[in-house]
Regions:
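Catalytic cores of soluble metabolic enzymes centered on carboxylation/carboxyl-transfer
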Residues: 2-232
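Short Pro/Gly-enriched beta-strand edge/turn motifs at strand-loop
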Residues: 27-28, 241, 251
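Structured, non-catalytic alpha/beta "coupling" segments that mediate domain-domain communication
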Residues: 44, 54, 250-273
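A structural detector for short beta-strand units
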Residues: 213-215, 232-237, 254-257
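Generic beta-strand structural signal
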Residues: 219-220, 240-241, 260-262
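Glycine-rich, small/acidic residue-mixed loop/short-helix segments
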Residues: 223-225, 236-246
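Well-ordered beta-strand segments characteristic of repetitive beta-sheet solenoids
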Residues: 225-227, 248, 268
Length: 273
C-alpha cells in the first residue's frame, strides 16, 4: 500500500487494506476501474514527537493526555493513548489524522481546526506547526513545493497572547486548588472554595515560555474566587472538575480547559488550543 492510503480511501470509499488481504488470499479485486469515482478532497497530517522550534529535533517522554477532537469528523490512525510512552528507539510518529471535505480549502481549514482541538500533552509535538501550515495563505493557494518550509517559513509555534496565558494559569491554579481539596480528609462534602471565614489570598507563580505569570486568588463565602493577575481582578467560579477537564466561569464567561500535571509542570489546553 502507498504510505498515505487513507487519503485514497477517503475520496474513493474503498477499503484498500481489505483489498490487499483479499489479493493475498488469491482472490480478485472486488471493484474494477470503471467502478471507481473521486469524491471531494481528503487531507492527511502526521503528528510527530518533535520540536519544530529546535530544527524538528525528535522528542520523547510520556503521553499524559491524548484526546481526539470532537469538532468535526476525522479519521485517526494511531497507536498511542493516554499513558503511552514515546521512546527513542523508533520513529516518533504519534498519529495520522485525516479529514474529508468537498474542496481542498475546506479540507485544509477543517483539518486545522481538528488539530487545534486534538489534545496531546506531555511531550512537544509538531501539532501547532501543522496548524500554521494549513492556515497559511500560500498553502491554501496551492503554492506548495518541496522547499515550502524554507521558502514560506510558516511559524514554528502558535502565538499565544498574554490574556490566554493568564487564563491558562488560572485554570491550572483552580485545578490544583480543587485537587488539593479533594485529597483532604476533612469536610469533603463541602464544595471547593467554601469557607466560613475569609481566608488570606493564595499565591502561585507560573512560567510559560519566556513569560512569567503570578496568580493570587482568594476564596469567597459563596464558593467563588477573586483572582488577581497583572492588573486584573476577576471573579472565577468553578463549575465542574471532571477527570482532566476543569469547567469554570471567568467574569461570567464560561470556559473549559484540560489540565494535567507532571511533577512541577502544569499543561493546559483551552478553547484556542
Amino acid at each position: 500500500l502507498q504510505v498515505e492510503h487513507p487519503v485514497t480511501e477517503e475520496v474513493t470509499g474503498l477499503d484498500l487494506v481489505r483489498e490487499q488481504i483479499l489479493i493475498a488470499q488469491g482472490m480478485p479485486l472486488s471493484v474494477s476501474q470503471e467502478d471507481l469515482s473521486i469524491n471531494g478532497h481528503a487531507m492527511e497530517v502526521r503528528i510527530y514527537g518533535e520540536d519544530p522550534a529546535n530544527d524538528f529535533l525528535p522528542t520523547a517522554g510520556p503521553v499524559l493526555l491524548f484526546e481526539r477532537s470532537k469538532v468535526a469528523d476525522a479519521r485517526y490512525d494511531t497507536g498511542i493513548e493516554t499513558g503511552s510512552n514515546v521512546g527513542i528507539e523508533f520513529d516518533p510518529m504519534l498519529a495520522k489524522i485525516i479529514v474529508h471535505a468537498p474542496t481542498r480549502t475546506e479540507a485544509s481549514l477543517r483539518l486545522a481546526r481538528v488539530l487545534e482541538t486534538t489534545r496531546i500533552q506531555g511531550l512537544i509535538t509538531n501539532r501547532d506547526f501543522l496548524v500554521s501550515v494549513l492556515r497559511e495563505q500560500a498553502f491554501l493557494d496551492g503554492d506548495t513545493t518541496t522547499d515550502y518550509i524554507e521558502r514560506i517559513n510558516p511559524p514554528r509555534s502558535r502565538a499565544v497572547d498574554r490574556g490566554q496565558i493568564i487564563e491558562g494559569a488560572i485554570a491550572a491554579a483552580m485545578a490544583a486548588q480543587y485537587d488539593r481539596r479533594l485529597a483532604s480528609n476533612t469536610l469533603k462534602r463541602i464544595r471547593s472554595g467554601w469557607r466560613n471565614s475569609i481566608m488570606p489570598p493564595e499565591h502561585v507563580e507560573y512560567t510559560c515560555g519566556e513569560e512569567e505569570v503570578t496568580i493570587d486568588y482568594q476564596s469567597q463565602r459563596d464558593g467563588s474566587f477573586n483572582v488577581m493577575a497583572d492588573d486584573l481582578t476577576l471573579k472565577v467560579e468553578l463549575v465542574e472538575r471532571d477527570g482532566n477537564t476543569i469547567d469554570m466561569t471567568v467574569d461570567g464567561r464560561r470556559v473549559a480547559y484540560t489540565v494535567t500535571s507532571n511533577e512541577d509542570r502544569w499543561l493546559t489546553h483551552g478553547p484556542s488550543g
